[in-house]
């Protein structure tokens, strides 16, 4: 039942989730206790491992026992066995425990003091929780169910997956929106909720609970990645703000009270999502992480994995690459776009690792978040803090110079100075070359649509050249160094990724993505008329400006580590990977992670070079604070307005009569019955009951590459001419008919004809449920 099994069901579901999460954190702590990770990072990695186990272990047993309680009990037993084995094999020595930070309360206080991002995370997490609470089928006083603006669409699809997987228990699962078709959408983001729903949680609780853990993993994974990359809390803090509180310059189009009022009353007329003004770079929290579960759960794996892999490359330990490979291999059926983005990131990082030996080595404090008492004690000598480059509370010019030198040249060990100089030059101009290339392509495309027709070919050629260059560097590396060094790091990682990912890709992804509308030419993402640079300037806003400056403000070392965004942007701007061109933003936003990191570091460098001088006087401080406030306003105001719109949005999703009808359907029908309904995206039958329908909404099925058109036509025929469509009722094995104002408003329903094929068995207001007569199937 979508209402759940009361307190017992809720406790069982929460307990099941907590057991996997807690055991995963235990495993992470045991496996990483001897590594130079903070406990925060260890528990983050462990929580990711726990969620991966919750997503995958029931499915492994579901092949034999279907998606049943038996499969889930066996999955839990497997997790317990894994915990016992890890606890038995992995011992944390007393020395390693003593060397570890956060053993005392003072260390935790220092953690919060040196990483103020916790405050922003808490505020943003509260916003996320409130939106989920008010948007997830909230029961109204009249019995109807309500939602918000961003969740009005996709949430219905996710509900249909969650309820059908749990109720029908067939594995591999099929589309309840199009029976007979294998569910090839990355459904592990929903099966995790199906597990909790199966335990007895209400649909609302099963939907929300895993998302709360996932958003914290996204927040922490992003911050750890930037912190490891730059080794500075302030850079990670600014990057976090630029990414999660993004807004662009769309606010300039809302220049009077009437337009501002429409932000909070119209459907999708916000400063970050306004088609008429070509505003397409949506607010991350509102339009990516709240409504798009695959993106949320994909990033919950991807961001911590990137931070973890960063460290693995630096220390070159086989165990870390093994752990990273297993996690990466689990990604395709959680979020395919994240898996593709990870592949491009790893390709660039591998190239950098082959050419510059110690590029990923960062100060030890970065890995411990500057909280270890030992590292902190060593940073103070003769009354000055050398680690932060501050003397008596002031940033010294010598510390800045030494930091810049070490950042740009200290990571070139093992590579020739000529190679380093050449790579330093190209990385500083790569962004401008790319912008010039795409601007010229846009001008050519406007006259003859060359890029729209041949973008895929251009992309393939570019990627092929990159792969050839990577192969060349690989050969040179193997000629000069031991192959074992590479085989037991990147080699193991690649093998494990292929072992775990290929079965998923062949079983689910490739079969559905083989249509003509998937991998194809498409130029310039969602730009509808603006000049190339202007489009991204007004959509990205301050991060784009700072990115332009970063080429000359940021060290070459940091520019190189951030280079994956160049490859991601190149690929995503020339080809589309599914029927909805707009969905390339799921790749572009991963590229934006690196853009925000570089933009944040550029801002820090600007302050240290020019702003620190003015900080010494009261007037100077006021000026710096005012300038910082203005920059924050420009960067975030569009995002805040969009978040405010989401905060107050409220729409009826299912009427009270529809909800009551669904309760009746759950009680009186079997999970495998097929019900005839309209193809509306918010049809309550597949979402609340998990029953299969003849055809779901084209807004879902088309973008999944499914051939639904005949089913859609047959649905209309069965409503408009039921007496002459008896063969269709038999063909689709329709057991029940659902009739409401949705169906009356969509089709010219022949009610008299329906009486010839079915009988009314339930009715309330405008909603009725009909049972197809047995004689139809004779």
What annotation goes with each model-predicted range?
Residues 69-141, 233, 467-477, 481-482, ...:
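Start-transfer (signal-anchor) and selected internal transmembrane alpha helices
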Residues 607, 611-778:
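Extracytoplasmic
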Residues 124-301, 336-340, 651-652, 679:
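Active-site lumenal/periplasmic loops and adjacent helix-entry segments of GT-C-fold
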Residues 1-111, 367, 373-376, 399, ...:
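Membrane-embedded, hydrophobic transmembrane alpha-helices
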Residues 128-132, 245, 249, 334, ...:
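Transmembrane alpha-helical segments
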Residues 286-289, 321-335, 347, 438-440:
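Membrane-interface alpha helices of multi-pass inner-membrane proteins
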Residues 354, 402-403, 410, 425-439, ...:
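Signature aromatic-anchored transmembrane alpha helix within multi-pass, membrane-resident enzymes
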Residues 304-312, 346-347, 464-479, 539-559, ...:
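Hydrophobic, aromatic-rich transmembrane alpha-helices
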């Amino acid at each position: 039942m979508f209402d759940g099994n009361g307190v017992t069901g809720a406790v069982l579901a929460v307990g099941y989730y907590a057991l996997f999460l807690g055991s995963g954190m235990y495993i992470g702590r045991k496996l990483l206790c001897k590594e130079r990770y903070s406990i925060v990072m260890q528990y983050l990695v462990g929580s990711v491992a726990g969620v991966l186990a919750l997503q995958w272990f029931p499915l492994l047993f579901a092949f034999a026992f279907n998606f049943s309680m038996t499969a889930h009990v066996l999955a839990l037993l497997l997790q317990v066995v894994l915990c016992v084995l890890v606890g038995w094999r992995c011992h944390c020595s007393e020395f390693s425990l003593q060397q570890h930070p956060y053993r005392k309360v003072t260390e935790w206080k220092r953690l919060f003091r040196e990483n103020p991002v916790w405050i922003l995370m808490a505020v943003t997490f509260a916003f996320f929780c409130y939106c989920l609470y008010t948007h997830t089928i909230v029961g109204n006083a009249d019995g109807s169910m309500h939602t918000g603006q961003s969740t009005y669409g996709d949430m219905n699809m996710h509900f249909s997956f969650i309820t059908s997987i749990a109720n029908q228990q067939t594995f591999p699962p099929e589309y309840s929106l199009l029976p007979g078709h294998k569910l090839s959408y990355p459904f592990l983001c929903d099966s995790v909720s199906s597990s909790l729903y199966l335990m007895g949680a209400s649909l609302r609780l099963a939907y929300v609970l895993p998302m709360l853990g996932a958003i914290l993993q996204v927040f922490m994974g992003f911050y750890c990645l930037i912190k490891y990359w730059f080794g500075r809390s302030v850079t990670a803090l600014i990057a976090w703000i630029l990414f999660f509180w993004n807004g662009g310059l769309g606010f300039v189009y809302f220049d009077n009270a009437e337009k501002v009022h429409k932000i909070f009353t119209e459907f999708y007329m916000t400063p970050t999502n306004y088609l008429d003004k070509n505003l397409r770079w949506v607010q991350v929290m509102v339009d990516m992480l709240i409504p798009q579960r695959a993106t949320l759960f994909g990033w919950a794996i991807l961001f911590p994995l990137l931070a973890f892999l960063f460290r693995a490359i630096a220390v070159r330990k086989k165990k870390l690459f093994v752990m990273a490979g297993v996690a990466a291999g689990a990604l395709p059926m959680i979020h395919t776009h994240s898996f593709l983005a990870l592949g491009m990131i790893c390709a660039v990082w591998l190239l950098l690792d082959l050419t510059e030996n110690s590029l990923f080595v960062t100060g030890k404090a970065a890995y411990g978040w500057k909280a270890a008492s030992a590292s902190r004690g060593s940073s103070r000598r003769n009354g000055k803090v050398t680690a932060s480059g501050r003397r008596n509370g002031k940033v010294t010019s010598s510390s800045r110079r030494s930091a810049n030198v070490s950042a740009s040249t200290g990571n070139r060990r093992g590579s020739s100075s000529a190679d380093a100089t050449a790579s330093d030059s190209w990385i500083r101009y790569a962004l401008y070359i790319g912008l010039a290339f795409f601007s010229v392509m846009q001008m050519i495309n406007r006259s003859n649509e060359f890029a729209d027709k041949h973008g895929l070919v251009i992309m393939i050629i570019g990627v092929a050249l990159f792969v050839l260059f990577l192969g060349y560097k690989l050969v040179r590396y193997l000629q000069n160094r031991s192959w074992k060094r590479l085989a037991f790091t990147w080699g193991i990682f690649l093998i494990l990724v292929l072992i775990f990912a290929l079965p998923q890709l062949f079983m689910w992804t490739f079969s559905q993505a083989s249509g003509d509308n998937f991998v194809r030419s498409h130029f310039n993402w969602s730009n509808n008329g603006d000049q190339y640079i202007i489009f991204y300037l007004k959509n990205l806003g301050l991060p784009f400006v700072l990115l332009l400056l970063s080429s000359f403000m940021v060290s070459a070392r940091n520019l190189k580590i951030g280079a994956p965004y160049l490859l991601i942007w190149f690929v995503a701007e020339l080809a589309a990977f599914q029927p909805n061109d707009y969905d390339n933003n799921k790749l572009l936003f991963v590229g934006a992670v690196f853009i925000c990191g570089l933009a944040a570091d550029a801002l820090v460098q600007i302050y240290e070079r020019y702003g620190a001088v003015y900080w010494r006087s009261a007037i100077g401080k006021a000026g710096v604070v005012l300038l910082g406030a203005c920059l924050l306003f420009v960067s975030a105001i569009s995002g805040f307005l969009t978040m405010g719109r989401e905060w107050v949005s409220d729409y009826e999703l299912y009427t009270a009569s529809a909800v009551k009808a669904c309760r009746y359907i759950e009680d009186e029908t079997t999970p495998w019955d097929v019900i005839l309904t309209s193809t509306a995206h918010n049809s309550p039958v597949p979402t609340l009951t998990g029953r299969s329908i003849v055809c779901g909404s084209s807004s879902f099925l088309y973008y999944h590459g499914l051939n639904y058109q005949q089913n859609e036509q047959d649905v209309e025929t069965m409503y408009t001419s039921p007496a002459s469509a008896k063969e269709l009722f038999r063909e689709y094995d329709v057991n029940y008919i659902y009739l409401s104002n949705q169906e009356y408003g969509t089709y010219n329903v022949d009610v008299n004809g329906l009486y010839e094929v079915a009988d009314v068995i339930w009715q309330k207001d405008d909603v009725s449920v009909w049972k197809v007569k047995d004689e139809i199937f004779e």
